[in-house]
């Protein structure tokens, strides 16, 4: 009796080999296809709305300090409560998306956050505003937790760095436009009107996202059983690289948010006395982040994430050093370089998550972003204490300490062995 053996690859007729290749290509979305364009445009809109809704309040902090009679650290809560609840929500919405799917969770999240922002514009009390900002953050966790996972599942691995970079470019443009629009508008209209404008723009972005994002093709439902969830979290923390990437997210985002939370206070005071509208216009430094997130993401695909991560953190340190100088001609370029480095580093680190997490990718993305937004919330408010104690020098020392931790983590990540079955990263 003869045993049947599978034919070797060179024995398979070329027509069949072509069919096999075509089938594999159909699993992933390839660069240059209409599906790729729809996907990156939709996620760009989602990233835009997320960061615009979160960070539109940052230029308003000095104004809110005066209007509600709160200090700088208390004023920073309008951002910290949103990012803090977003971080908590990530631990819930990520696993939910692993069970029920990606697109429905993201669409619901965007519309809910936009509507909460519109409602916050009508709130007359500080505590009422903080409550709705907390709901904005909780809602946005549904997009933030799932977007990275969706891309890692649907986009071909060789293009994931570019796709993730374009998504983060949407974050950068949203953060810039949110700050720019409110920063300029509050010189001419009330902060309530400025918030209504941002909420309206986010509703438009949510509608575009809903209409053009392709449905998932590679999604496989996972159990929501507590044991299954615990196994996923345990597996990620046993990995040599993922906990380091989670720590990297915390310190990088903490440094970035702290700088932009308090640079406005510095520029409105002596020796600059800049107008509020002019301080708001400085949000154009985000343009460097728009470029770096896509460019560095693509370079990481070619040169490796290990090299690009520490290099972009070094750029952040150089930018911080420039902001410590007194001349405005050095401070503004420093903000530009710092922003370029941050978005480049975030693009590299976030695309690395999908390469390290071989299972339960939604949970891995949620843990990364939990750390990311926890860093924003904790360090963003702690920076207010540094400002109170030492002014901008105190803030600079605090940010510098965070970046030195980030650099040491990047060096450790560069020394990790490549996972079996993965290409070098």
Ranges and model annotations:
Residues 306-349:
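C-terminal transmembrane helical hairpin of 12-TM major facilitator-type secondary transporters
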Residues 112, 116-119, 127-135, 329-337:
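Paired small-residue
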Residues 69, 101, 122-128, 156, ...:
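Helix-breaking motifs and short loop linkers at transmembrane-helix boundaries and internal kinks
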Residues 132-171:
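Cytoplasmic helix-loop-helix junction between adjacent transmembrane helices
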